Curated annotation (Swiss-Prot):
Family matches, as SUPFAM superfamilies: Recombination protein RecR
Record Pfam families: RecR_C, RecR_HhH, Toprim_4
Family: Belongs to the RecR family.
Zinc fingers classed as C4-type: ranges: 58-73
Function: May play a role in DNA repair. It seems to be involved in an RecBC-independent recombinational process of DNA repair. It may act with RecF and RecO.
UniProt name for this protein: Recombination protein RecR
Chain's gene name: recR
Keywords attached to this entry: DNA damage, DNA recombination, DNA repair, Metal-binding, Zinc, Zinc-finger
GO BP, sorted A to Z: DNA recombination; DNA repair
Family annotation (InterPro entries): DNA_Rcmb_RecR, Rcmb_RecR, Rcmb_RecR_Znf, TOPRIM_dom, TOPRIM_RecR
GO MF term list: DNA binding; zinc ion binding
Amino acid sequence: MHKDSNIIDELIFSFAQLPGLGNRSARRIVLYLMQDKEVRIKNLNNQLTSVLNNIMECDYCGNLDIVSICNICKHSERDSSTIAVVESVADLWALERSKVFKGWYHVLGKTLSAVSGNDAVNSLKLPKLLNRIREYKVQEIILATNSTIDGQMTAFFVIDYLKDENLKISKLASGIPLGGELDYLDEGTLLAAFKARQSHDLL
C-alpha cells in the first residue's frame, strides 16, 4: 500500500478498533470493500446511516431496537416476574439466541471495578431497575453478569443495592468458566447455568 494512502490507512485503523478485529482483518475488509466500492461501500454507508437514524435504546431495559420500548419488553408472553441483569446488549442477545430465558432484562451497560467512582455506579441505571421491580411486582432477579472479577464485583454491588427488597436474587451457576463471557457460551452451558442458579445467600 502506498505511504500516501492516508484515507485508506484511517479506514483500516477504524476497522481495527472494532472488537475481535486486528490490523490484518481490517486490511482484508477494506480491500474487500474496495473491490466493488460503488456497491459495497454505498450499501454499508446506507446501512450505517439507517442504524444511526433509527436504532435507539429501550427506555425499560436498555436493549437496542427501532422503538423506545423494545419487542422483548412489550411482548405479552414474557415472564414479567423475573428480570435477568446482564452487562451488555451482547449478553442479552446471547441469552435470546439460546432461548433459555423468557423473562425481562436489565442491561447495566458496564461493570464496576475496584477503582470505579460514582459516575460508574450511576451509569448502571439501578434506580430504573428498582422502579420496574416495584411497579411490576418482580419476584426474582437473576444476576447474569460475566464470570470475571469486575462482573462478580458488579453482581455483589447489585445484591447490596436490592437487599431491602422482598424478592429472590440468584446468580448463574458456577458452570460458567472463570473469566467466561456469556456471548461466547453455547446453549447447553447457558441452560445448565440457569437451571442450577444459586440464591445470593449461598454466594
